[in-house]
Amino acid sequence: MNMFSSFFPNKEHDLDGRTLKQRFENSNNGVLVDVRTAPEFNNDTIPGAINMDFMSPGFQKEVEKLNKEKTYFVFCRSGGRSSAAASVLRKIGLTSFNLIGGIGAWPH
């Protein structure tokens, strides 16, 4: 492990905006998940995304209701909350990917 590995994620589930958008568009079962707060979501989001506030007390219960047949593409403002949320999804057996850099990294 070199000194830069902690600064630059090299995980197969952490994707740049172009790659994540491409995988989502090519997926026949993909779900975009905005894990920001409701006010953030209502202000601006990626069209078609659902909102699941990672910081809400009910987040874990919402996650447990998700369809295991779907693939989840998770994002937030900067990539921190979504990285943690995507990890939670994977821990319960869901397929999920994190948008590195957050909503601003999504290509328009």
Predicted segments, located by residue:
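Flexible, polar/low-complexity N-terminal or interdomain linker segments that lie immediately upstream
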Residues: 1-43
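Conserved protein kinase catalytic core
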Residues: 40, 59, 104-108
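Short loop/helix-cap segments at secondary-structure boundaries that form the rim of catalytic
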Residues: 41-47, 89
